[in-house]
């Protein structure tokens, strides 16, 4: 059987885009501008469970992936954070013009307690320790709740056209701001820079801080036969 050059190239491209699954605690794969992590950082809190993450495809700057898990025990404790992390050069917030992103996702399974969130970190220097964590929860499923010093929101802002409850609390030496959508948002398109602009104008966040990490994924607390599907995710820092 003869193959044309175009067919051969198509097969090569298909091979390069073949799905890649990994189930180890710190498993990851690099695709385009993203590192996709399994990141079972809290698995020791579970009495039983497992999780596997799969890279499906990359088209331009849009990544498609999923993670499947079952976790029990360790009530109220996060077991993992499977996520797509953007590779970029850290920039001062004052120099960040936009963080454009799109995200379409879905969840299935039994008794799911989990969040679906952007997780972004700020530091006083490009390579320094994280000083602030900014989370944007598009979904708080099954009663999942954010870090909070009081258990109550400190504000109820509307950002990127979505109404949020804003919480504040410590995570070690970091201060964590969590924007939790009042209604689950399974399809998002907007500029994540707007969240920092809000914090600068209303919570005194310094624009001299460096944006050092932009991640997006899911934090499971408990549930079984869970399938978290990301059918469209992209983000870029400009």
Swiss-Prot record:
It catalyses: xyloglucan + H2O = xyloglucan oligosaccharides. Its EC number is 3.2.1.151. SUPFAM superfamilies: Concanavalin A-like lectins/glucanases. GO terms for molecular function: cellulase activity; xyloglucan-specific endo-beta-1,4-glucanase activity. It is an enzyme of class 3 (hydrolase). Its main location: secreted. Residues 1-18 form the signal peptide. GO terms for cellular component: extracellular region. Keywords: Carbohydrate metabolism, Cell wall biogenesis/degradation, Glycoprotein, Glycosidase, Hydrolase, Polysaccharide degradation, Secreted, Signal. GO terms for biological process: cell wall organization; polysaccharide catabolic process. The keyword Cell wall biogenesis/degradation applies. Glycans are attached at residues 106, 171. It is found in: Secreted. Pfam families: Glyco_hydro_12. Catalyzes endohydrolysis of 1,4-beta-D-glucosidic linkages in xyloglucan with retention of the beta-configuration of the glycosyl residues. Specific for xyloglucan and does not hydrolyze other cell wall components. Belongs to the glycosyl hydrolase 12 (cellulase H) family. This is Probable xyloglucan-specific endo-beta-1,4-glucanase A. It comes from Neosartorya fischeri (strain ATCC 1020 / DSM 3700 / CBS 544.65 / FGSC A1164 / JCM 1740 / NRRL 181 / WB 181). The lineage of its organism: Eukaryota, Fungi, Dikarya, Ascomycota, Pezizomycotina.
